[in-house]
Amino acid sequence: MPKMKTKTAAKKRFKITGTGKVKAAAAGKRHGMIKRSNKFIRDARGTMVLADADAKIVKQFLPNGL
């Protein structure tokens, strides 16, 4: 059976932590930020941990745990 390839798009967008959780950038900050609250803008600046259901899907795209 051939080796599983890593999805390059997922490799650029997600990181797997040492404990196995998946980190990603917060969504909703490309445009239209003028109407958002300062708290939203502040919270969207960093990364967030994905929910377990989403993390399970992302881990299939990253078989080598990049």
Curated annotation (Swiss-Prot):
Keywords: Ribonucleoprotein, Ribosomal protein
Signal peptide extent: none
Keyword Protein biosynthesis recorded: no
Recorded superkingdom: Bacteria
Ribonucleoprotein among keywords: yes
GO BP, sorted A to Z: translation
GO cellular component: cytosolic large ribosomal subunit
Pfam families the UniProt entry points to: Ribosomal_L35p (PF01632)
UniProt family annotation: Belongs to the bacterial ribosomal protein bL35 family.
NCBIfam families in alphabetical order: rpmI_bact
PANTHER family for the chain: 54S RIBOSOMAL PROTEIN BL35M, LARGE RIBOSOMAL SUBUNIT PROTEIN BL35M
HAMAP family, per database record: Ribosomal_bL35
Protein name, as recorded: Large ribosomal subunit protein bL35
Organism of provenance: Brucella canis (strain ATCC 23365 / NCTC 10854 / RM-666)
